[in-house]
Structure formats: C-alpha cells, structure tokens
Amino acid sequence: MPYIEPVRTAEVWDPELRELIERCERLGVPDSLFPRILARVPAYAKALLRAMLLSHTEGNVDHKLKEIIRIQLARRAGDPYFAGLRSAKAMADGLDEAAIAAGCDDYERSPRFSEAEKWALRYADRMYLDPASVDAAFYAGMKHHYSEAQIMELGAFIALHYGMQVFMRTLGNGAPT
C-alpha cells in the first residue's frame, strides 16, 4: 500500500475528476490508483491527469511508440507500478511485450525499430542518462525524422511521465493492483 492512502472512488465528488479517473482506467495508464492518490488535491489531480492523458493519447507521435518510451522511463525510474501498467489502446493497436522488451533493451541494434523510432527512444534515454548530450547537434539530428512540434510533444511527454513515475516510486507502491 502506498504511503499516501488513495481516496476511495465513492469519495471523489468532482464530476470532471471522476471522468478523468474513468478515462485512466479505460486506457490502463495510469489505472485508478495514482489518480485516486492525486485526488487528495482535486485541482492538481485534474491538471496532471489531463496533461498525462493528452500527452499520451493525442498528438502526432505514434501512441505505441509513446507507450514503449513510457515503460522504458518507468523502468529507468525504478517504478514497478508504472512499469507494470499497459495501455489498452497501444495493446489493441498491436503493441506486444516483445516490442516493449526491445525498446527497453538494446533498441539501437534492433531491426524492429525505424531510425525515427530509435531517435525517439534515444531522446528519452539521453534526457535522463546524459542530458548534456541533448544539444544543438542532437536536435538537428532529430529534425531529420520529426517536426519541431513532434519534438516538443516527445520532450513534454518524456519529462511529465518520468516525473510522475519518480513521484509514484517515492510513494512506496509496488506492482499495479
């Protein structure tokens, strides 16, 4: 059980927050646990959940790729909760555990990923392992595969989800319930 007790679903009175929690449950990422912990501060919960859902399910970068990145980051953050969750949408669209494993391992040598996908995975790696290497030359290389808008979409997604994963890890929860 996490160090901060989640609010019971029946105690969530704000209709927008209830709908966001239901959307999270349908997607599977996050399930209802993390949103119900955040629900102790409803305004913050709504803002964070809207941002998490928007960054993960919308935009012009493939959702399956974002899901691989999200899991890669959760593993890097040492968070078994987020690392164990799977997007129902990504799985329905054909993402499988073999692709996730390849994206979290030696994706650079994997024939499974295009050069563009490798750049996105590399971006996530470098933002947390070697941020100094994400420089003008790195962005110039990314621009061969992604528009500036897509780069911003990926960067914001990476920063937000990694931060939430580190936060959840500090709350002391293990694998998903």
Residue ranges with predicted function:
Residues 1-63, 87, 91:
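Mobile cap/lid helix-loop segments that border enzyme active or cofactor-binding sites
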Residues 33-37, 63-78, 108, 152-155:
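Alpha-helical scaffold segments that form or flank carboxylate-/histidine-based iron centers
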Residues 41-45, 72-83, 120, 124-131, ...:
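Alpha-helical transition-metal enzyme core signature, strongest for iron centers
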Residues 61-62, 96-97, 147-148:
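Helix N-cap / loop-to-helix initiation motif
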Residues 66, 70-100:
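Conserved alpha-helical segments that form or flank metal/cofactor-binding pockets of metalloenzymes
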Residues 94-96, 169-177:
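C-terminal end-helix/capping segment
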Residues 103-113:
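Acidic/His metal-coordination segments adjacent to aromatic residues that form catalytic metal sites
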Residues 112-156:
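Acidic/histidine-rich alpha-helical segments that form the ligand environment
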